[in-house]
């Protein structure tokens, strides 16, 4: 495992208390969450980081960018957050928005977002986040970890395929002569 070049520690935010009642394998994971309130979570401004990092990517696809829709998605009851903070200032430098879900009959940890502040890129924080999510996936007895990546985002595709060893998921849509998809679905299976 690569070492992170800056001192950081991890906080997992849990947005909703009703989520554990719906996920049979997750009762032992609740000890990982902090007591940070929903208000503190909103004050983190992760939506601003996500907008800075991803707005232009979305705008160049058929999906387009919709701020209200993205904010709604990020604050749904099923949302979990892994937040990396600098240990000296306690300021957030990266986050991942993820969910425990059922996807085509598989119990999965679905990574919705992984965002790193520009000044902290290239310091193995993304790899640290993904390795942490993989361990959480295994500990929670999920069958796979899954994510969606834009095809135009070559850096992200290279990171997930080459560094993290994700494969094209069987649910990923294939381009045809009539239809082109702006994204692909990648996954890594466990168990």
Sequence positions of predicted segments:
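Conserved N-terminal entry element of GNAT/NAT acetyltransferase domains
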Residues: 1-45
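Acetyl-CoA-dependent GNAT
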Residues: 45-112, 117-118, 130, 135-136, ...
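S-adenosylmethionine-dependent methyltransferases
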Residues: 119-120, 139, 155, 184-186
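Conserved acetyl-CoA-binding loop-helix of GNAT-fold acetyltransferases
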Residues: 122-135, 162
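Short glycine/proline-centered loop/turn elements that form peptide/ligand docking sites
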Residues: 130, 152-156, 173-179
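Conserved GNAT acetyl-CoA-binding A-motif
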Residues: 138-148
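Conserved catalytic-core motifs of GNAT/GCN5-like acyltransferases
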Residues: 148, 164-185
């Amino acid at each position: 495992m690569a070492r992170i070049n800056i001192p950081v520690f991890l906080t997992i935010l849990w947005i909703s208390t009703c989520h554990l009642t719906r996920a049979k394998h997750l009762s032992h994971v609740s000890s990982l969450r902090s007591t940070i309130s929903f208000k503190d979570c909103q004050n983190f401004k992760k939506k601003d980081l996500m907008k800075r990092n991803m707005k232009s990517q979305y705008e160049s696809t058929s999906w387009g960018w919709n701020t209200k829709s993205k904010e709604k998605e990020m604050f749904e009851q099923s949302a979990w957050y892994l937040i990396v903070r600098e240990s000296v200032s306690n300021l957030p430098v990266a986050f991942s928005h993820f969910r425990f879900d059922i996807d085509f009959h598989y119990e999965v940890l679905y990574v919705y977002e992984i965002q790193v502040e520009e000044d902290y890129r290239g310091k193995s924080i993304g790899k640290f986040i993904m390795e942490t999510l993989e361990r959480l996936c295994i500990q929670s007895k999920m069958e796979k970890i899954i994510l969606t990546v834009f095809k135009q985002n070559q850096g992200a595709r290279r990171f997930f395929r080459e560094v993290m060893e994700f494969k094209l998921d069987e649910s990923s849509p294939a381009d045809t002569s009539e239809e082109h998809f702006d994204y692909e679905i990648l996954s890594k299976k466990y168990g």
